Amino acid sequence: MVKNSYVLFARLCVELPPLPSDESHGEITTVERQFLRNCQMELENLSLKTELPLVYVDESKYWRFIKTVRVLAEVFNNMKTTRTTRKSIIQVLMNPILPSERSTDAMNLFLSTIEKLADLQFSDEDFNQLFVSSRLDLQLENKYNDKVEVKLRKEAEDALARKIKEVVDLTERLLQVEALEHKHKAKLQLRTETETAVAIERDYMRWKAEIFESEFNNQLVLRRESEIALDKERKELEGIKNLLETCFTGQKNLKSQVITWKDKYDQGSSIRKEKEVALSTKKLELEIFKQLAGSYKQDADAMRQERDNALKTVQEIVDEQQPPPSFICPITQDVMKNPHMAADGFTYELEAIQKWINTGHRTSPMTNLKLSHFSFFPNRALRSAIEELGR
């Protein structure tokens, strides 16, 4: 309702000619400033709590309308607002600016918005005639519009209801379309996010697979290197184990040979002591024979002969003494000069056992079993014993 009044004000401001103003120091100004300055204040202070009439307007509101025009005239005092200008103002205010069926409502609305203006007297005869003529036209128009108003209002209400229904239906369809579009966008966004997440997950899994494959290849290389080193160490350990077993066997055989040789040496020592005792006895007897030689020369010669025979016998016994069996090579049956121990635990002359192997033999000369290896180790203890015997 106030909006229609603003339309009237705008129409008035456009139609009226510009006038000079004292406030602008003689510059040309329009009615828009003064008109809006006064009437806008009244509109802002106006209370529209009660519904305004649409057709009937009482006489007091017409007189208020006249007073409003006088207010406009007072704005341009000192004869600045001429008679022609006042008529122009009235014509503009009374000229309908809306369709014919709503012009009465527009005028009534405008009159209701200015009912608070102060009471002033206005005696312009031409204005009164124009006002009465306008009032008669307005009454005729009200009578004519009185019949069609209900019909037009009903048609307008029906049209408005149809329009509202169409607007509601259109709004519902638009809301449905918007909801479907929003749902489609949400699904599309969810699908895009899912595809992005799947792509990221796929790239991550591919990256992890590459890392695992690289680590697996590195572990495989390390495992192969470890297996090669382990095989090498295993072979070295087997060689050391075989060598240790050979050493243990040789040591055992050597111990048994040393014990045997010691027993034989002890036996030889006891025999040698017995021979020495016998020899000392013989020497003692020879001494006795020598002492008795002077008196028994013949007996001395006999005893000398007997002594020589005894010495010869002793020398033969010494010469006939044989070395221990451990000093003799099982292959050559001679006393060994360079004894070496083989894989079977027996000691042989190095040259004889090498010749045995070189002729194609792979078994032990003593046990006839296959030798586990063909390495030979010097038997230094036996060699020292043989050298001691040779002295």
Swiss-Prot record:
Taxonomic source organism: Arabidopsis thaliana (Mouse-ear cress)
Transferase found in the keyword field: yes
Upper classification of the organism: Eukaryota, Viridiplantae, Streptophyta, Embryophyta, Tracheophyta
The protein, known as: U-box domain-containing protein 57
UniProt keyword terms in alphabetical order: Transferase, Ubl conjugation pathway
Recorded metabolic or biological pathway in which this protein acts: Protein modification; protein ubiquitination
One Pfam family cited in the UniProt record for this chain: U-box
Root EC class: transferase
Gene: PUB57
Described function: Functions as an E3 ubiquitin ligase.
EC number assigned by the record: 2.3.2.27
Top-rank taxon: Eukaryota
Family matches, as InterPro entries: Ubox_domain, WD-SAM-U-box, Znf_RING/FYVE/PHD
GO MF: ubiquitin-protein transferase activity
